[in-house]
Amino acid sequence: EVNPDINVNVETYAGGELGTTFNNSASAYEDPTPATENAGMTDKFKYGEYFFERSYTQNSKPFNGLGPLYIRNSCMNCHPGYGHGKRVDRYRADDWGNGYLLVVTDGKDNYLSSLTGMPQTKAVAPFKAPIDEDKIKIDWLPYTDEWGNKFPDGETYSLIYPEVTIPQDARSEPLEATYNQVVTPVNYSDVVVLLESTIGIYGTGLLDAIPDDSLKAEYARQEKAGVKLNPAIFANGEWTSLYKGLTGKQYPKRYTYALTRSSIQDGPGANAIWNITNVTRSDRRYHYMTDT
């Protein structure tokens, strides 16, 4: 085996027996899992790395087809070292490590349908991006929590949160939301802009491994404890919506910022690598764009 047994208790494996690497160097988070290597799938892992690490362009093969609108030109831009994005003070798609994605809603948690769920701020000529990222403003403001930013032993801590502003002259698309299949104008004063940040690639398989019944039990436990849950996902001890997978089978939602996906094969990365760059493929002959 590529990764033979070593004298370590299994319960200490952070990623379980199939997913723990014992490389403690700076490249540890970029490793294939032992299960991947022991199954003889290293080549497939490397092919995946090619897609993940390369920058896409408009014309240079084989990593061509960027745009016409896009969010980033590579996965690594948002996931430096396969990790999560870093905190930044401005929104620039080309800034290395900026893992932020914009979330633009009508103020009632409904995404604007005139923009893509992950709004695009880049375009290839002669196209124009729907949002001028140079005009996006990010302010980090101090925040005081319900405990007064203090631990029980008296130690204090500081918190900050982002306030994002996109001025009216920064957009080239109308402000619209769709309610019951009816496109409706949204007032600029009602628009709310939030930031979604990328997560680390490592560990996402562990989320996929959580049994569906265990996920439901945790939702029920939190609901019973009085935690405010999204009624569009779970209410009164039951799922109120499920995700229909590629096979037609329904699963609880567990992936993406908006909980729109259920399986890692049809979830983060599997779709984002195409949506982020807007590259098409032989079985995906469409772009990530709105009708607007």
Where do the model's predicted regions map?
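Extracytoplasmic redox metalloprotein regions
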Residues: 22-24, 28-45, 53-292
